[in-house]
């Protein structure tokens, strides 16, 4: 454990539950790396991800974006391919892109969008895209005929969230350079989306624990009952 991390960790009371603004302030104070660290939100949910009816997955456009340049690959043909190019997609194609991914193990993109009619060919690389979280999905709005809107939202700061095997959602909410106010707006947008996505089958306390941290820094716990303050 580095010296900077140990010094930073002293500023945060591990037993305390902060309100969102306090937690974000502390996270920014403890982000001491010499690059613009990403600020992440971690939420443990009262769900059992082993059950299909307790999956939590979706997407939300963060009001202040992510601070990251997102490269979008679109599987589309004809008019939809032209629409995707016009909307600012970084890569557009069909079979030739599937071949490139298969033969070159090519991953120079961050999000994959596909029109529904292309899912047959995209399915051929599902085993490659799936483990990297790149497989297009209707729930996250990445399988759609409205490719222009999908690209626009992704470029504007749309993030996907998905509960992992341990019932935790990890999601970036911006960069250190955003400052507390912008990060708080993004934090709230994501928390509201998670609450709306609560499965009907989830019983008991839904927000089990909430915390924020920077790429290299310690985490600050947020009081789950105040997470939407």
From Swiss-Prot:
Matches recorded under CDD domains: Ribosomal_L1 (cd00403)
Q: Which GO terms describe its molecular function?
A: rRNA binding; structural constituent of ribosome; tRNA binding
Which InterPro entries did the record assign?
Ribosom_uL1_bac-type, Ribosomal_uL1, Ribosomal_uL1-like, Ribosomal_uL1/biogenesis, Ribosomal_uL1_3-a/b-sand, Ribosomal_uL1_CS
Question: Would the keyword tRNA-binding turn up in this protein's UniProt record?
Answer: yes
Q: Which GO terms describe its cellular component?
A: large ribosomal subunit
List, alphabetically, the Pfam families matched: Ribosomal_L1
Tell me the keywords, alphabetical order.
Answer: Repressor, Ribonucleoprotein, Ribosomal protein, RNA-binding, rRNA-binding, Translation regulation, tRNA-binding
- Family annotation (SUPFAM superfamilies): Ribosomal protein L1
Concerning PANTHER family, the annotation shows: 54S RIBOSOMAL PROTEIN L1, MITOCHONDRIAL, LARGE RIBOSOMAL SUBUNIT PROTEIN UL1M
Q: How does it assemble?
A: Part of the 50S ribosomal subunit.
Could you tell me what this protein does? Answer: Binds directly to 23S rRNA. The L1 stalk is quite mobile in the ribosome, and is involved in E site tRNA release. Protein L1 is also a translational repressor protein, it controls the translation of the L11 operon by binding to its mRNA.
**Family according to the record:** Belongs to the universal ribosomal protein uL1 family.
Q: What is this protein called?
A: Large ribosomal subunit protein uL1
Query: What organism does the UniProt record list as the source?
Result: Clostridium beijerinckii (strain ATCC 51743 / NCIMB 8052)
